[in-house]
Swiss-Prot record:
It catalyses: 5-amino-1-(5-phospho-D-ribosyl)imidazole-4-carboxylate + L-aspartate + ATP = (2S)-2-[5-amino-1-(5-phospho-beta-D-ribosyl)imidazole-4-carboxamido]succinate + ADP + phosphate + 2 H(+). Gene3D superfamilies: ATP-grasp fold, B domain (3.30.470.20), Phosphorylase Kinase, domain 1 (3.30.200.20). This is Phosphoribosylaminoimidazole-succinocarboxamide synthase. Keywords: ATP-binding, Ligase, Nucleotide-binding, Purine biosynthesis. Pathway: Purine metabolism; IMP biosynthesis via de novo pathway; 5-amino-1-(5-phospho-D-ribosyl)imidazole-4-carboxamide from 5-amino-1-(5-phospho-D-ribosyl)imidazole-4-carboxylate: step 1/2.
């Protein structure tokens, strides 16, 4: 696909988004920046952008092959990809299969507790408010999404959880929890967006429960790039990804 990168449209914590000569296509460059606690902790980690781009590209391609519509078009280089332009729904959708992180602190349930069924949580995307946990009633109040869009998002999220658990199970990795974002394309269709990587997923080794995700950075537990490289290598060994 011959697309020309134009001016910078938006720079976030982990990615730069550029306009292109096609109004419906955007150019994404993954950065080596690492942040945690709503930007309170920051670092530059060489190789992180490459690994997140490669892992996210692999996963989005797999999900597309399974019939799950998403914004990914193609990988351009180790750190770059093309995506469909969408209007982001201001919600972070978190799926929890095992208790960890903020859920453990909030509810007083020990980290590592298996959930009988996945729990879906919604967070309002607003840095100034600290991305608060909200209910579906709050979503209507904030006009963040319509009831129909929320039902579509929940349905897609459930399917994505099943697919991701299958992918990571084949890699001998436990999918503890993960964050999804969604957008609306030019026709108003809900599409899976943003990224799916160890930045947005909690991933533990199935045998040892070793953390292979951004908690290594959050909690100063070890090398982020070594863990991300391990996830990338395990995914690369799966024939269906």
């Amino acid at each position: 696909m011959n697309i020309v990168k134009n001016e910078l449209l938006y720079e976030g914590k982990a990615k730069k988004i550029y306009k292109t000569d096609d109004e419906n296509t955007l150019y994404v460059v993954y950065k080596d920046s690492a942040t945690a606690f709503n930007g309170e902790k920051k670092a530059e980690i060489s190789g992180k952008g490459r690994l997140n781009n490669e892992i996210s590209s692999l996963i989005f391609k797999h999900l597309h092959a399974k019939g799950i519509n998403n914004h990914f078009i193609e990988r351009i280089s180790e750190t770059e990809q093309l995506i469909k332009k969408v209007t982001i729904v201001p919600l972070e959708v978190v799926v929890r299969n095992v208790v960890a992180g903020s859920m453990s602190k909030r509810l007083g349930i020990p980290e590592g507790t298996e959930l009988e069924q996945p729990i879906i949580e919604f967070y309002y995307k607003d840095d100034a408010l600290g991305d608060p946990l909200i209910t579906e009633d709050h979503i209507w109040l904030l006009k963040a999404a319509t009831p129909e869009q929320v039902e579509t998002i929940k349905s897609i999220t459930t399917i994505v959880n099943e697919e991701l658990q299958s992918i990571f199970d084949d890699c001998h990795v436990r999918l503890i929890d993960f964050k999804l974002e969604f957008g609306l394309d030019a026709e108003g269709q809900v599409l899976l967006a943003d990224e799916i990587s160890p930045d947005t997923c909690r991933l533990w080794d199935k045998e040892t429960n070793e953390k292979l995700d951004k908690d290594l950075f959050r909690r100063n537990l070890g090398s982020l790039t070594d863990a991300y490289e391990e996830i990338f290598n395990r995914l690369g060994g799966i024939h269906h990804v």
